[in-house]
C-alpha cells in the first residue's frame, strides 16, 4: 500500500468510528451490503449514511446523523453506513438499492427494501446543521413509528 492509500485508510477509520461508536454497522464489502439488504425485515426501517472524507461530512452529515439516530423519539430499526471512496464496491452495491444519482455524503431511509427518503449532498453541504437534523427528524417521525 502506498503512503497516500495508507493515510486515507487511517483517516477513514477515524471518520467511520464517528458512526460505528454510536451504533452504526459498517458494511465494508459488496457481499455485506447484499446480505444485509436481502435479509432485512419488510417492516424494519434502515437508516443508511453514505460517509465521505469531505468537510461537509465531518461538520454536518455525521454529527446530524448521530444526533437524530440516537436521540429522536422515533428511530430506525437499524443504522448502517458505507464509505464512499474507501469501500467502493460496498458503496456501489448500496447505491444499486438506493437507485438515486451517486452522492456523498448522503442519507437514505428504507422500509424493508423500499427507499422512503433520500437526502443527497446538495441538501447537506452549506446548510445549517439544525435544518439537516430537522429534515432527518421529520423523515424518522413519518417512517419509523
UniProtKB/Swiss-Prot annotation:
- Upper classification of the organism: Bacteria, Bacillati, Bacillota, Bacilli, Bacillales
Residues in coiled coil: none
Q: Supply the name of the protein.
A: Bacilliredoxin SAOUHSC_01436
**Which GO BP terms apply?**
cell redox homeostasis
Annotated family: Belongs to the bacilliredoxin family.
Native organism is Staphylococcus aureus (strain NCTC 8325 / PS 47)
**Record's InterPro entries?**
BrxB/BrxA (IPR009474)
Gene3D superfamilies hit by this protein: Glutaredoxin
